Swiss-Prot record:
Stated role: Is the initiating enzyme for colanic acid (CA) synthesis. Catalyzes the transfer of the glucose-1-phosphate moiety from UDP-Glc onto the carrier lipid undecaprenyl phosphate (C55-P), forming a phosphoanhydride bond yielding to glucosyl-pyrophosphoryl-undecaprenol (Glc-PP-C55). Also possesses a weak galactose-1-P transferase activity.
Stated name of the protein: UDP-glucose:undecaprenyl-phosphate glucose-1-phosphate transferase
Spans within the Cytoplasmic topological domain: 1-15, 60-80, 126-278
Note: Complements holdfast synthesis in the C.crescentus mutant lacking hfsE, pssY and pssZ genes. Can also partially complement the O-antigen defect in the S.typhimurium wbaP deletion strain.
Cellular component, GO, one term: plasma membrane
Reaction(s) the record says it catalyses: di-trans,octa-cis-undecaprenyl phosphate + UDP-alpha-D-glucose = alpha-D-glucosyl di-trans,octa-cis-undecaprenyl diphosphate + UMP
Topological region Periplasmic: 37-38, 102-104, 300-464
Any one GO molecular-function label of the UniProt entry: glycosyltransferase activity
EC class name: transferase
UniProt key word Cell membrane: yes
Protein's pathway: Exopolysaccharide biosynthesis; colanic acid biosynthesis
Compartment list: Cell inner membrane
EC number: 2.7.8.31
Length: 464
């Protein structure tokens, strides 16, 4: 088969997958509502059909806005499913507002909730099957794309290796093209940049990933200009991986493309989702633990003289000072420029306080901090101001922890990095996990951390 025919077949297969996705989404939505009505003993009425159509239209509009029906090849399934459920949730919320005007509101609301839950499962399962099916086809030579890397950046090599290690993605690596250096060429070398242009013109390559240094701007511009005379897709790998980037993404500022190196993941819709998550969880948890809070408050009051609640100054989001609430666990309270970290068998800790610290129950009042907006359920744990000033000079990127709100529990704590940080290495590991959390943030990641906290995050021998 000629290269041109391979290219056309790849485009046809990609379009076919997109059509299958759209058709399956529509089918699952209507089938889900019909099934819920059947199980509930209700007729599938004209009103159900009308609202389902409106929901579908909204879902398709959101799909266009978020570019949902693009190719998800090479993108993690969790990312695709998160956007799928986000669009579906917003669509159902919109249609539920229409149902609110119905006379039999309670019954219709139950139907809508059941439809939402059933269809959510169906959409995710169907997308998983499509991914598996597409992967099988690509493993057998269908829907393949021939790709090449231009340049010798490490990021380009990493991308090439990932394509080779994941054949189900359907990317077949032609090789690496760059002008040879005095040290010779690697085994992956397929030719110089001029050879790349000739191969692209001959239809041997579908995608070209440019992985060249920032200082090679003139060469990059020349190569892009030459590739404009071909039909291959040209993608640029930004030379930003020399930096320890934090939640980078492509943005536009007054028509100028920019790539943030250090930024917060909590902007726009993500910020609203995170705040909604905090308010709902904190409210439910406070209602559930209110008897426990009263018992702990009484125990603290009887254990030693002093207030029940201790308010500590900590750095919040963007490094702004906040007051963090805790049950008092010590006979003395330190909140000065110099803070002595609690150690094992610390004489300042009361007997009740020792139990509270080991079980993290002393931190329960921080759910009030969450409601007031100073903290989050999940995030990097807040450190003493004195420790912040100390470690920001010793650990690169330490202050990047403050690109999100501090949390009651966090990814570092789940992985065992809590309690006394008596060595620099321990603090470095804690910061490493905190920054990993910020890079990988999602609502589902938060839920995972909350779930793990219930089983392994509260009691820890390192806490005293």
């Amino acid at each position: 088969m000629t290269n041109l025919k391979k290219r056309e077949r790849a485009k046809t297969n990609a379009s076919l997958i997109s059509m299958v996705q759209r058709f399956s989404d529509i089918t699952i939505m209507f089938a889900g509502l019909w099934l819920v009505c059947e199980v509930s003993g209700l007729s599938f009425l004209y009103m159900h059909l009308l609202v389902a159509l409106i929901t579908l239209v909204v879902f398709q509009m959101l799909g266009g806005i978020t570019d949902f029906y693009r190719s998800w090849r090479g993108v993690r399934a969790a990312t695709e499913f998160a956007l799928l459920l986000q669009n579906w949730t917003l669509s159902v919320i919109f249609s539920a507002g229409l149902v609110a005007f119905n006379n039999d509101f309670d019954t219709q609301l139950k139907i809508w909730l059941a439809w939402y839950a059933l269809t959510s499962i169906g959409l995710v399962v169907c997308r998983s099957c499509i991914r598996i099916g597409a992967g099988w086809l690509r493993n057998h030579g269908y829907n393949k794309r021939m790709v090449a890397v231009a340049g010798d950046l490490a990021a380009g090599q990493m991308l090439m290796e990932s394509f080779r290690n994941q054949p189900w993605l359907g990317f077949e690596v032609v090789g690496v093209y760059h002008d040879p250096k005095p040290g010779g060429v690697s085994n992956d070398w397929a030719g110089n940049l001029q050879q790349l242009v000739e191969d692209a013109k001959a239809g041997k390559i579908h995608n070209v990933y440019i992985a060249m240094q920032m200082c090679d701007g003139a060469r990059v511009k020349k190569l892009v200009h030459q590739l404009a005379d071909t039909t291959c897709s040209v993608l640029l790998i930004p030379d930003v991986f020399t930096f320890n980037i934090l939640h980078s993404r492509l943005e536009e500022m007054n028509g100028v493309p920019v790539v943030p190196l250090y930024d917060t993941p909590l902007s726009g819709v993500n910020r609203l989702l995170k705040r909604a998550e905090d308010i709902v969880l904190a409210t439910l948890i406070l209602l559930l633990i209110s008897p426990v809070l009263c018992c702990i408050a009484l125990a603290v009051k009887l254990s030693s003289p002093g207030p029940v609640i201790f308010r500590q100054t900590r750095y919040g989001m963007d490094g702004k000072p906040i007051k963090v609430w805790k049950f008092r666990s010590m006979k003395v309270m330190e909140n000065d420029k110099v803070v002595t970290q609690a150690t094992q068998n610390d004489p300042r800790v009361t007997k009740v306080g020792n139990f509270l610290r080991r079980t993290s129950l002393d931190e329960l009042p921080q759910f009030i901090n969450v409601l007031t907006g100073g903290m989050s359920i999940v995030g990097p744990r807040p450190h003493a101001v004195a420790h912040n000033e100390q470690y920001r000079q010793l650990i690169e990127g330490y202050m990047l922890r403050h690109k999100v709100k501090p949390g009651i529990t966090g990814w570092a704590q789940i992985n065992g990095w809590r309690g006394e940080t008596d060595t620099l290495e321990k603090m470095e590991k804690r910061v490493e996990f905190d920054l990993e959390y910020i890079r990988e943030w999602s609502v589902w990641f938060d839920i995972k951390i909350v779930f793990l906290t219930v089983f392994k995050g509260f009691v820890n021998k390192a806490a005293y």
